[in-house]
From Swiss-Prot:
Keyword Cytoplasm recorded: yes
Biased composition (Low complexity): 17-55
Region Disordered, residue ranges: 1-59
Coiled coil stretches, renumbered: none
Organism field: Rattus norvegicus (Rat)
Major localisation: cytoplasm
Chain positions found as Phosphoserine: 16
Name of the protein: T-complex protein 11-like protein 2
Function, in words: Promotes the migration of muscle-derived satellite cells (MDSCs) during differentiation throught interaction with FMNL2 and therefore may participate in microfilament assembly.
Cross-referenced InterPro entries: Tcp11 (IPR008862)
Length: 517
């Protein structure tokens, strides 16, 4: 069957489909997937040319904007399917109390009320019912593979709209019989996850409610089929992702001027910082016409800045838009891990001697910190209050462990000092946070500098042992995002570096520093 463990769809003269089942309407629905389109067109027309562009800015036509948005949408969807193994379409339910949701419910209810009145009239009016069966027929046929097969012919024969209209003229339409046939056919081609829905349909006695639920289940079946198509095309997209995404982004650049303005500024800030640090190290050194800094080092520093990015206030570089949600989630998790490491370091420094040899206690304190710091990225989160609670809980757990060993508990002064140091972690320039942040950055940087042939991970810096497992997982995710981004956008970065570093000099050496494969 097409679905992994799911029922097979119906194929040529059979009651089942092969693994290569393709549905015309399913692929069309993929274009509905929403994605971010900001920063490519919003500011480009009002800004002067960036250093990466030598041609004067031109006006942006509406068609250019729409074409760029379409390319960006396609590129984002392909990227999401390729890198997110869990990506799938889900029902788009409107909020229950929203205006749009209320309007939709009222309009739909009005339609079904009219249908019920028509079918209850004497004689019955079948016009709306016929239109529904016509739509149902098209949906069922869209689930089948192209070409003639027995089920295709059967659906067309049973749901022959012209014949049904002739029967309606003589008030001889068997609405219940048609609905039962539709439900039976749906049961043959649906995924196992819809079996319960089919059973509920068969148990429905009211014909109008039955038709209403048929459309609900058909919508779910279309979504199932689309997700099946996504799963099947994922390996193909992954294989061609770098070339496809690069070509799509090139089309965006051709449609919109200065479409790399944010990316150029992102790279320029790191270049300026590196050049400034070189000047600080050797203030008397003779100025060289050729910058000595490595473009790859600058690019890695740019990627490291993303781990401290303010995703609420700052717009991401255009070349990283497709990975924005993943980078934001990764950064939020990393901040939580950093705080857990800070709490653990303070605990070990203050009461490590009395808790030595109690690994269960360390794990329990880590779980307490993780739970109380859950959601710390939200603006409504009270970090100081959470840290205070962690301090109180830590003191209680340590005292409990000490009592079990027959040792004296922590005195009030030590407990107050411990809680106070915990709450001070929310201060901007806290030295413990700065130290942990520096070590995490060092570890992440070492991941980016690993040779492609090296399989082993770099060692985790001291003080991060408590979060080593989680840090390695996040580090692997981060390195995968960065390495794919380098492969796709390496040529664009190289071009920007040429113009920022060498201006009018035709320097081709930079290409060797930026891997594009």
């Amino acid at each position: 069957m097409p679905f992994n463990g799911e029922k097979q769809y119906v194929n040529e003269d059979q009651q089942s489909d092969s693994e290569s089942s393709r549905f015309s309407e399913s692929t069309a629905s993929l274009s509905d997937y929403g994605c971010s389109r900001q920063s490519f067109t919003s500011d480009s027309s009002s800004k002067s040319s960036s250093p990466a562009s030598t041609s004067p800015p031109r006006g942006i036509m509406f068609d250019d904007v729409m074409a760029a948005a379409k390319n960006l949408s396609d590129m984002t969807l392909a990227h999401e399917i390729a890198v997110n193994e869990n990506f799938q379409l889900r029902p788009n339910a409107l909020p229950e109390n929203s205006l749009a949701g209320q309007v939709k419910r009222v309009v739909h209810q009005a339609f079904w009320d009219v249908l019920e009145a028509d079918l209850s009239a004497e004689p019955p009016q079948y016009e709306y019912a016929i239109k529904l069966f016509e739509e149902i027929r098209e949906i069922l046929l869209s689930f089948l593979t192209p070409g003639g097969n027995r089920l295709h012919s059967q659906i067309c024969e049973v749901l022959d709209i012209d014949l049904i209209r002739q029967q309606a003229e003589h008030s001889a339409v068997d609405i219940q019989g048609l609905a039962n046939y539709v439900i039976s056919t749906m049961g043959k081609i649906c995924a196992p996850v819809r079996d319960e829905d089919i059973r509920e349909l068969k148990a429905t006695t009211n014909i109008v409610e039955m038709l209403r639920q048929i459309f609900r289940v058909l919508d779910l079946m279309r979504m199932d089929m689309t997700n099946f198509v996504i799963r099947n095309i994922r390996p193909h997209i992954q294989h061609h992702l770098v070339e496809y995404e690069r070509n799509k982004f090139q089309e965006v650049l051709e449609e919109t001027p200065n479409a790399l303005s944010q990316t150029t500024e992102w790279l320029k800030e790191s270049i300026d910082k590196e050049l400034f640090s070189e000047t600080d190290v050797a203030p008397g050194a003779e100025h060289s016409s050729t910058p000595s800094l490595s473009p790859l080092t600058v690019l890695n520093n740019c990627y490291l800045k993303l781990l401290q990015w303010d995703y609420q206030k700052n717009v991401l570089p255009e070349t990283l838009m497709t990975d924005g949600p993943r980078l934001q989630e990764l950064t939020e998790k990393l901040n939580q891990l950093k705080m857990i490491a800070c709490v653990s370091l303070i605990t070990n420094n203050m009461v490590g001697a009395v808790t030595e040899g109690l690994p269960e206690l360390a794990n329990r304190l880590k779980r307490i910190s993780a739970v109380l710091l859950e959601g710390m990225s939200k603006q409504t989160f009270n970090l100081k209050e959470a840290l205070n609670s962690i301090g109180v809980q830590t003191c209680a757990e340590v005292n409990k462990a000490l009592k079990e060993r027959g040792s004296p508990t922590l005195n009030a002064e030590v407990q107050a000092n411990l809680v106070g140091q915990f709450t001070s972690l929310e201060e901007k320039d806290n030295p413990v946070c700065a130290l942990m942040d520096k070590r995490i950055q060092l570890y992440m940087k070492s991941l980016l500098c690993l040779p492609s042939t090296q399989k082993s991970r770099p060692p985790v810096p001291g003080g991060l042992d408590v979060i080593q497992q989680e840090l390695e997982v996040l580090g692997c995710q981060y390195a995968n995002i960065v390495n794919l981004n380098k492969q796709v956008y390496g040529p664009f970065y190289a071009n920007i570096f040429r113009k920022l570093l060498f201006r009018d000099e035709a320097m081709g050496k930079i290409d060797a520093s930026l891997p594009t494969n």
